[in-house]
Amino acid sequence: MLLEQVIYIMCNLEVSKNNSSRNKLWSLIFGTQLLIIDQLVKSFFINFLKKTPGIAISIFKYFKISYVWNYGISFGIFNYYYDIGNIFFLIVNTIIVLCICYLITKAKKLLQFNAYMLVIIGGTSNIIDRMLYGAVFDFIDIYLIIFNLADLYIFVGTILLVIYYSYYE
C-alpha cells in the first residue's frame, strides 16, 4: 500500500515549466557524476587487477571483484565474434543512446526523465569502454553474473521506466 503511494507520487512529479531547466540541470550534473564514477572505478580495477586476469577477489560468499572483458553483449553473448562484434555493438549502442536522447526531450515527468538519464549514462559509459578498450570491462561478480556500474545504471533506469509506464501510461 505504501509502496504504491510512493510510486504514484514519483510517477506524477512533473518536470514543470517553472523549474524544468533546474531539474534537468541537476539530473545532468548527477548523471555526469555517475558516468565519471563508473569510468574511474573501471580504470582503478583495470589497473589494479591487470596482472591477475581471471582471478577473482572474494569480498563476500557470493560477491567478488573479477577482471573480465566483455566483447559481446549481456552475459557474454557473441563474445567470440570480436572482429565484427565491437564495431557492430559500438554502432548499435550509439544509435540506441541517441534514440533515448530523443525520448528524454519528450519526458513530462521527473521519474521518466531521470530513468532515461540513467539508461543514457550507462549506455554512454559502455560506449566509452568500447572506444577506449575494444570491449566493455565488467568487474562486479555476483554469483553467476558479472557486470559493471554502467550496466547497473541501465538496469535501474529500465526498471524505473517499467514502473513509470505501468502506473502512469
UniProtKB/Swiss-Prot annotation:
Entry membrane topology: Multi-pass membrane protein
GO cellular component terms given for this protein: plasma membrane
InterPro entries with a match to the protein in the record: Peptidase_A8
Catalytic-site annotation from UniProt: 138, 151
Enzymatic reactions: Release of signal peptides from bacterial membrane prolipoproteins. Hydrolyzes -Xaa-Yaa-Zaa-|-(S,diacylglyceryl)Cys-, in which Xaa is hydrophobic (preferably Leu), and Yaa (Ala or Ser) and Zaa (Gly or Ala) have small, neutral side chains
Principal subcellular localization: membrane
Subcellular location: Cell inner membrane
GO molecular function per UniProt: aspartic-type endopeptidase activity
The enzyme's E.C. designation: 3.4.23.36
Any single GO BP term: proteolysis
Domain of life: Bacteria
Keywords: Aspartyl protease, Cell inner membrane, Cell membrane, Hydrolase, Membrane, Protease, Transmembrane, Transmembrane helix
Pathway listed: Protein modification; lipoprotein biosynthesis (signal peptide cleavage)
EC class (word): hydrolase
Membrane-spanning residues: 26-46, 55-75, 84-104, 117-137, 142-162
One Pfam family cited in the UniProt record for this chain: Peptidase_A8
Residues of the signal peptide: none
UniProt similarity note: Belongs to the peptidase A8 family.
Summary of the function given for this chain in its UniProt record: This protein specifically catalyzes the removal of signal peptides from prolipoproteins.
PANTHER family: LIPOPROTEIN SIGNAL PEPTIDASE
Protein name: Lipoprotein signal peptidase
